[in-house]
Amino acid sequence: MPVYMILDAELHIAKPENAAAYDRYKEAAPEYVARHGGEYLCRGGAIDVEIGDWEPERVVMLKFPSRKAYDSFMVDPDYKPWKKLRESLSTIKKLVVLEGV
């Protein structure tokens, strides 16, 4: 059963060097997602909150073929340095993983 990961992040890229580092992350990350059968469904872009008071900054949605594939992505030792870089450049405000159909 597929799973979807949805996250809302606050970026800390006001400094040019941080923006450049985040650009490197954005270029590298899809390779590691794909290694585990994952794909990006959305990555940033315009957001319209239709109901509620949620104020997302940057929303990313990934699809993986299974929870096991998602979990293996999250602990991939090759992805670890990139994950650490992302963590230094952003704060994850919300992250959910849900089963698909």
Task: Show which residues each predicted segment covers.
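C-terminal structural segments of small proteins and small subunits
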Residues: 70-71, 78-88
